[in-house]
Amino acid sequence: MRKKKFKAESKRLLDMMINSIYTQKEIFLRELISNASDAIDKIYYKALTDDSLTFDQDNYYIKVTADKEARTLTVTDTGIGMTKDELEQHLGTIAKSGSLAFKQENDSKDGHDIIGQFGVGFYAAFMVADKVTVKSKALGSDEAYVWESEGAAGYTIAPCDKETIGTEITLKIKENTEDESYDEFLENYRIKAIVKKYSDFIRYPIKMEETVNKPKEGSENEFEEVQEEQTVNSMVPIWRKNKSELTDEDYEAFYAEKHYGFDKPLTHVHISVDGAVRYNSILFIPENMPFDYYTKEFEKGLELYSNGVLIMNKCADLLPDHFSFVKGMVDSEDLSLNISREMLQHDRQLKLIAKNINKKIKAELKSLLKNKREKYESFYESFGRQLKFGVYNDFGANKDVLKDLLLFYSSKEKKLVTLDEYVSRMPEDQKYIYYASGDSYERIEKLPQTEMVADKGYEILYFTEDIDEFAIKMLTSYEEKEFKSVSSADLGIDSDEDEKQTEAEENEYKDLFESMKEILADKVKNVRASKRLKSHPVCFATDGEVTIEMEKVLNAMPDSQQVKAEKVLEINPNHEVFETLKNAHGQDREKLALYTNLLYNQALLIEGLPIHDPVEFTNDICKVMV
């Protein structure tokens, strides 16, 4: 029998497909099962247009059989089969797809779409097999043929005996090497796991022989092991069912079955789109974050299916980083089964799906926020930080998408509020959205800088996470109201009379403040009379964009450049301490230095900043006490 050569640059092309397109050897079984499913689909389609054919789905199946002794793995289908010419065309030409040609010829619009449109999947078998044998008998033919190949060298086609319509593909599994073990592809448990992973939702039964224990005939207490044919795939994916048929329990069972999380999901979104791009999707928003969520080990992404066949465990391109907590899957008939990660990044359909999913997630979160506030706050406790990162990242590109999902603790309401809720309560004379930063709500409430804003009756948002101020700086404003830190030099509250009084105090005590600035040198940008303090003697204000809390965050980072906020030491001119400062300025330079350093260190402590010289600080306290 003469060996024929493949109709392509076979060795180079075969090597490229095996080594580049497929990154995991187990993929070969997914490809063979998908081809088998296509073969049955073709009979189904023909039956729709040919009255002489009937399609009883119970008669159609795929069977996978392993033989350890012979080192063979066989995939059998009851599909349409192939003639000699079709074997030549579809298996003799690498990257020739019979399914694609069939689809183009028949232009199927009945929803029974064909998976294998790309003609390379079959050759994945050579990743695990030394030899591939294909026996096939075509529908309407009396003859059967066998196609055999040991790889790039070529193939043979000859007549063979086969009674039933369909195709039988037998792989002679490779022997183990030092680097690779191929025995796993002869183990039933491993084969079953691969089927469940990639082909669980193929619409036809995938059968395997399973070893089960059954009572011996005529004996109640004795059991024997027998081989029994069982269907190992689920066949009907939940995402193709009508939403009205499904309960919350159905979705929760799917969530658990797919190992998306150890707890129940907070909510789910079931999407079915039949437009410019067709896809089905089930998305889950978890209540609790995974233990590794804020680590570099965490991988975002949704499971990606092509017509029910898994093509990627985690497709990162489907989710923006700010929604990386979402779990779930997408199934589209418009995606290539053999598409690579690199190609996915530029796939137009995938980009459309990702854009739509992004909108659906936001809509679901907004619905939770509006209608199930307690649930949303539970979610926000786990993932609010990620939403804030989303506002800050990419130079604020997503801030408009996320701003209405943010929550912050309110000084007035004593609970989390949205920016919209804050703005809706603002008095007419309030110009800014005020915020204060600190380690906890309790500490922020005691900050001296909050006194003036609070006395004015204005609401203050409390920022307790390191990302908060960075996100707000990127947001800059909400509903045309700018954000303003209570530590800002200008709070936008003073009346004209207040301005005149402050200016007069600055002029009157100019020499005192200049002396204090001289004592502190470059530790502060300036010393001045405070407009914001009521009962406290001292605090820091900041000039410029970098606040004290931002300074802490930036300087805690690796390879920090030791960023410094432009600190201004503000003194309360109405506090008793101010009289002491005035007296010391006129009489005792050393005492002024002592009091100035004490007040500076007091301001550091209020902000939670380290004192530069704790020993000197304690000595200064002792000097005051004696």
From Swiss-Prot:
- Indicate where this protein resides in the cell: Cytoplasm
The Swiss-Prot or TrEMBL record annotates one GO molecular function as: ATP-dependent protein folding chaperone
Keyword annotations for this protein?
ATP-binding, Chaperone, Cytoplasm, Nucleotide-binding, Stress response
Q: Give the region (B) as residue ranges.
A: 342-552
Stretch list, region A: 1-341
Q: What is its main location?
A: cytoplasm
| Cellular-component GO terms for this entry | cytoplasm
Residue segments, region C: 553-626
Secretion signal, residue range per the UniProt entry: none
Would you say which domain of life the source belongs to? Bacteria
Pfam families named among the record's database cross-references: HATPase_c_3, HSP90
Q: What HAMAP family does the record point to?
A: HSP90
Role noted for this protein: Molecular chaperone. Has ATPase activity.
Protein family according to the UniProt entry: Belongs to the heat shock protein 90 family.
Q: Oligomeric state and partners?
A: Homodimer.
Q: Which PANTHER family match?
A: HEAT SHOCK PROTEIN 90 FAMILY MEMBER (PTHR11528)
What is the protein's name according to its record? Answer: Chaperone protein HtpG
- Report the source organism: Bacillus velezensis (strain DSM 23117 / BGSC 10A6 / LMG 26770 / FZB42)
Lineage of the organism: Bacteria, Bacillati, Bacillota, Bacilli, Bacillales
